[in-house]
């Protein structure tokens, strides 16, 4: 992947002029993956006592299968094919197969993985480092801040509030604008609520398909949050990714280099 400092070549655009930023929530502002890992590890031991004796590498593989949703069940939820609870149970079933759970314990226990797991994972919700500070700094420049997320608005509103983001009033869920990301509708709804032009609005997210491609199709400025993004001279500033035609940065702190833009 070719990444270039802003203005570093004829193909790299100058840093964008922007009036507002929309963020994805899960795995962009919230470290959901870590919370899912911790909650799965705790809950699977209640599903099957033998989990305590499984090879740690196998347990890690099963945990990642659940968190990364290797079966694509969350997408079926977003499209309306599954309920939220059904997609979670399907992900658990995949993970239990990976774990090698015996047949008599391989059916996910409904209440355990819905009510109980939900309580555990909420206890592990946390923002990525520097997130709260960077959001406050963006707001301090007078720019708008909002969220566009692929889960229902009420659930994500409660999540954001629990993370101390109740002041972020603009939150567009998968059910808010009539279609989920990557459809242009939720991005444009976010811009409308913020009162900003899409071409002067950043969209920061971790998904190339849902966040980057969706934002681009809606006319926003896409910024890909990618932990393995290269840094220019040790600085985690956003770099232009020529292959994907978007800006790319390792962590939210990279936005600080654009606060004066």
Regions found by a protein language model. Give the residues of each.
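Asp-based, Mg2+/Mn2+-dependent phosphohydrolase catalytic module
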Residues: 1-21, 33-34, 132, 136-139, ...
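Short, acidic loop-to-helix structural element flanking the phosphoryl-transfer center
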Residues: 17, 81, 85-86, 106-108, ...
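Residues in soluble alpha-helical coiled-coils and helical-bundle/repeat scaffolds
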Residues: 30-34, 53, 104, 122, ...
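An amphipathic alpha-helix signature
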Residues: 37-45, 85-93, 97, 153
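Alpha-helical elements of Rossmann-like donor-binding domains used by nucleotide-donor carbohydrate transfer enzymes
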Residues: 38-42, 65, 91-94, 133, ...
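Short helix-capping segments at alpha-helix termini
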Residues: 48-55, 98-105, 164-167, 195-196
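A metal-dependent, Asp-based hydrolase signature
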Residues: 65-116
């Amino acid at each position: 992947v070719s990444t270039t400092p802003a203005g570093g070549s004829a193909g790299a655009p100058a840093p964008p002029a922007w009036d507002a930023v929309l963020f994805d929530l899960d795995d962009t502002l919230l470290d959901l993956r870590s919370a899912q890992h911790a909650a799965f590890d705790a809950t699977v031991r209640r599903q099957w006592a033998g989990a305590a004796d499984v090879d740690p590498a196998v347990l890690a593989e099963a945990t990642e299968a659940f968190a990364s949703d290797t079966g694509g069940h969350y997408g079926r939820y977003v499209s309306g094919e599954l309920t939220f609870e059904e997609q979670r149970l399907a992900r658990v079933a995949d993970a239990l197969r990976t774990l090698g759970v015996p047949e008599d314990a391989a059916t996910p226990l409904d209440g355990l993985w819905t009510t109980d797991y939900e309580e555990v994972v909420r206890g592990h919700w946390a923002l990525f480092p520097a997130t709260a500070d960077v959001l406050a700094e963006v707001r301090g420049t007078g720019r708008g801040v909002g969220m566009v997320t692929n889960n229902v608005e009420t659930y994500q509103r409660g999540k954001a509030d629990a993370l101390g983001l109740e002041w972020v009033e603009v939150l567009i869920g998968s059910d808010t604008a009539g279609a989920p990301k990557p459809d242009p509708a939720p991005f444009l709804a976010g811009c409308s609520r913020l009162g900003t032009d899409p071409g002067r609005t950043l969209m920061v997210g971790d998904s190339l398909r849902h966040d980057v491609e969706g934002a681009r199709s809606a006319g926003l400025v896409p910024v890909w949050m990618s932990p393995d993004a290269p840094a220019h001279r040790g600085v985690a500033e956003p770099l232009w990714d020529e292959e994907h035609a978007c800006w790319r940065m390792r962590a939210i702190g990279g936005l600080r280099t654009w606060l004066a833009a």
